[in-house]
């Protein structure tokens, strides 16, 4: 399934995962490679991850207005090296230029990529030891610490961080 192959790829290659609003939850939010949702209003560590990535592997992402903060370069950097995978060939490079565009079902493309990695004996690395993962994880932790007081706030009207925190606690 999509979650399993994405997580396998991310862990095997030590790739921090920034989701789009429509794909949030493909890997658990508490996974050390989960960097939140790409959006101008998203967590700063998600934007930092995209702004500083060597390569952006965009899986089924159409780079919509919400995700990109208005199609500019506030979320996706101007000089980004993007590999875009989409089932719709007209989506490839439509918003941002791509270094490589791959037409196909993202689950199938990821599964094929994993097979190639296995054939080439690219072993699973301890992703938590990757300097890049350590860097973005530190940014994530800093952000989590900065919003912790907002999650506990008793202010009226309710703070959005408190609202979402309480909803997460209440829902199964």
Model-derived segments and spans:
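Active-site diphosphate/adenylate-binding microenvironment
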Residues: 6, 135-172
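Glycine-rich, acidic loop regions that bind phosphate or pyrophosphate groups
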Residues: 23-135
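Redox- and metal-dependent alpha/beta enzyme cores, enriched for Fe-S-associated oxidoreductases
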Residues: 2-22
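Generic secondary-structure signature for well-ordered alpha-helical cores
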Residues: 11-15, 55, 115-123, 138-145, ...
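A short acidic, amphipathic alpha-helical/loop segment
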Residues: 2-8, 69-72, 166
């Amino acid at each position: 399934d999509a979650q399993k192959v994405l997580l396998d790829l991310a862990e095997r290659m030590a790739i921090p995962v920034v989701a789009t609003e429509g794909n949030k939850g493909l890997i658990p939010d508490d996974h050390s490679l989960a960097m939140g949702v790409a959006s101008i209003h998203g967590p700063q560590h998600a934007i930092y991850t995209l702004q500083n990535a060597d390569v952006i592997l965009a899986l089924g992402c159409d780079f919509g207005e919400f995700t990109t903060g208005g199609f500019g370069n506030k979320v996706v950097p101007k000089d980004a090296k993007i590999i875009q995978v989409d089932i719709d060939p007209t989506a490839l490079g439509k918003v941002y230029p791509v270094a490589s565009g791959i037409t196909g079902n993202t689950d199938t493309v990821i599964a094929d990529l994993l097979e190639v990695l296995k054939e080439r004996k690219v072993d699973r690395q301890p992703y938590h030891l990757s300097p890049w993962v350590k860097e973005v994880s530190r940014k994530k932790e800093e952000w989590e610490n900065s919003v912790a007081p907002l999650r506990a706030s008793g202010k009226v009207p309710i703070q959005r961080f408190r609202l979402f925190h309480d909803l997460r606690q209440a829902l199964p």
